Amino acid sequence: MPPSAQTQPKYKRVLLKLSGEALMGEENFGIDPKVLNRMALEIGQLIGIGVQVGLVIGGGNLFRGKALQDAGMDRVTGDHMGMLATVMNALAMRDALERSNIATRVMSAIPMSGVVEHYDRRRAIRDLKEGDVVIFCAGTGNPFFTTDSAACLRGIEIDADVVLKATKVDGVYSDDPMKVADAVKYDRLTYDEVLERKLGVMDLTAICLCRDHGMPVRVFDMNKASALINIVVGMEEGTLIERG
């Protein structure tokens, strides 16, 4: 049963990471409006109980650089194109949130005057305190860094209590549960266990960044009803990665 509006959240400020692929929903490419609307509803539930929400969205639903890089495209060019894809996703999510009457700001790591604001940490924290959702896009603004790394970086910068990584499975497994029937799910892991077992939940840079700054990460199934709000009020969902 979902928590009531009177429920006290365990986390006051969270950084939610959505993959670009998650926005595709049942489509093969692009953005499924039904997914946007559902995420807007779930984020609205968090705002409703007083949780401050920062958001990072990947760009894999619109651009995947690996195939082009394999064909000879420069890596930096491909990464810049990927950053632009995250801006497009951020604009789509902002639109969905604002249609749900949720005040939202989009901040880009690369200047895009007239389209979105440039990232400003102090301004972002002020906006979060005022109850606005803040969407951080364009990754870190640098090539060679994933949006998982960007999510962890922004989470640390805005003093979030936890990074919530939304995926298509309900946590971290010993193997890919889509391919290996007897894959074991972990309820809790340390950063070092993730690295030693090469579990691949996030890239090395992202996990090391969280480890060095003590930022807990919870991996959960974004398609499970009420999973997001359950986590925020302290219920067990998915896998928690933290210090040992």
UniProtKB/Swiss-Prot annotation:
One of its GO terms (cellular component) is cytosol. Disulfide bonds: none annotated. UMP binds at residues 59, 79, 140-147. One of its GO terms (biological process) is UDP biosynthetic process. The keyword DNA repair does not apply. Keywords: ATP-binding, Cytoplasm, Kinase, Nucleotide-binding, Pyrimidine biosynthesis, Transferase. Inhibited by UTP. PANTHER family: URIDYLATE KINASE (PTHR42833), URIDYLATE KINASE PUMPKIN, CHLOROPLASTIC (PTHR42833:SF4). Belongs to the UMP kinase family. This is Uridylate kinase. It comes from Hahella chejuensis (strain KCTC 2396).
